[in-house]
Every structure is written in C-alpha cells, then in structure tokens.
Regions:
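Hydrophobic anchor at the beta1->P-loop junction of P-loop NTPases
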Residues: 11
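P-loop (Walker A) phosphate-binding loop of NTP-binding proteins
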Residues: 14
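Conserved glycine(s) of the Walker
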Residues: 18
C-alpha cells in the first residue's frame, strides 16, 4: 500500500478502543492533519448542559447523533479540500451506536433499574427508531464510500476504564464492535484490523500505508496521550461546573422520559 493512494484515513472502533489516542499520535507521527470533531461528552455539554450522557432520552440521543454528524462532516470537508486527513472514527459510528441501542436499550451505561424502566417505556417506539436508523444507515454508508479511502479498525482488547464516565457497558462494546466492522467490510474500501499497544498499532499502520514519519513513535504516543488527557480534563471541568444534584426525583424523571 502507498500513502499516496490513501488521503482520507479512518481510525475506526467502538467506545474506548483508543481511537482518539491512536489518531492523534498518527497525526503527530506523519504530519497528516487530524479531523478535530467534538467528542460525544463535549456535545452533551453544548446541547444539554448539566445532563449526564446516560440520562439522555431517545430524542436527545438522536439530536446528539445529528450534531456530531454535522461537526464531523464540516471538519472532514475542510481537510479533504486541503489534501486529506486522519479521522477519529467515521460517519458510521453514530449509526452503529444507534443500532446497537436497539439491542441493549437506549442507556446501556446506566444503573440496572434505570435500564429496566427505560427499556420498557421505549419499547413501543422501537419500530420507528429502527426505520429511522435504516434511513440514517443508507446515508452514512453512501457518504463513507465516497469520503474515506481506508479504515484501520481497533478491536476491543481491554476493558473500559472504570472511571464512572462511560455511557455504555461491555456488552454494548462487543455488539457495536462486531456491527461496525461488518458495516465497514461491506463498503468495499480496504479495512485493516490493528492490535496491540499504541506503539504497535502505529507501527502497523505506518508500515501498511508506506508513508514517511516526522518523529519517533514513542514521542508521538507520549505527546498524544498528554493531548488527550488535557482535553478530557477540560471537558470534565465543564461537566462538573454544569453538574446538578442527582436527587431521587431527578433520577426518576430521567428514567421515565422517552
């Protein structure tokens, strides 16, 4: 493979597989610009200040998906016009995250009783959500075929960080990982699964692309980890500043919203 043939590179994977660290490090390592699209947690602080990801209603989750899609398309278009990019995920992610929620329920990262209530009250709306996601998927697949050249998929290799801020569970990760890889495989574009440490992943990607590097891999990984850590701390500070008391009344209110 030659880097000249692949201008629009996707680092793919489900939640907490290392997409952001890998895409940031690859950008530093190669000098190829990275798509700067906001994370889901950032978008939640913008659209729904004071709310936790796992408390979002199905309508709010759809709005979140639309907003992330909008930001991603805008950022990718700018860099595409400038010669190419490295993408942290793709337009397929929000679609697959939605289809997985049809199987796990809309709030897989919440408490057991919250999930039981939410899964029950959203059941009548499932046929509509399925039709909506089918239409979303048609659009996402078409755009992915037209706007990406190669996918590097990061599988689920380690458990999520138990920091209490993850909006999903391990079952959700396993299902969405399988669905995402299947969706990518059907596009017709090259897809390569890369495993191992951040350094091993980068070595595999650079070797497959056959492109020059501008710094040492270990340095790129170290700098990327610091960038990601600082970014997450800023988002967490915003979340804390917006946080509201999670009273029993509030818990019941959010659990019973469709």
């Amino acid at each position: 493979m030659s880097g000249n043939n692949y201008r629009r590179i996707v680092i793919s994977g489900t939640y907490s597989t290392g997409k952001t660290t890998t895409s940031t490090a690859l950008s530093l390592l190669t000098g190829i610009p990275r798509v700067d699209a906001s994370s889901a947690r950032e978008v939640v602080t913008e659209l729904y200040p004071g709310m936790r990801f796992q408390d979002l209603s199905t309508t709010e989750l759809m709005a979140l998906g639309f907003r992330r899609l909008e930001l991603r398309i805008q950022a990718e278009a700018i860099l595409d016009a400038q010669g190419g990019f490295i993408a942290d995920g793709s337009v397929l992610n929000e679609w697959i995250y939605g289809t997985t929620r049809l199987l796990t329920g809309p709030n897989p990262g919440s408490t057991r009783w919250h999930k039981a209530v939410k899964n029950t009250i959203t059941l009548p709306g499932r046929p509509f959500y399925r039709r909506y996601l089918n239409a979303y998927g048609d659009m996402a697949r078409q755009r992915a075929r037209q706007n990406y050249d190669i996918f590097f998929h990061l599988p689920v290799e380690v458990p999520m960080d138990p920091d209490g801020h993850r909006p999903v569970d391990e079952r959700y990760r396993a299902i969405s990982d399988r669905q995402l890889l299947h969706a990518i495989s059907e596009l017709g574009q090259p897809v390569v699964t890369v495993r191992g440490t951040p350094q091993q992943r980068l070595e595999s990607i650079v070797s497959m692309l056959d492109i020059p590097t501008v710094m040492d891999i270990d340095v790129a990984v170290k700098e990327a980890m610091e960038i990601v850590r600082s970014s997450r701390e800023r988002v967490q500070e915003t979340i804390i500043a917006q946080q509201q008391p999670n009273t029993l009344r509030r818990k019941i209110k959010f659990a019973t919203r469709v």
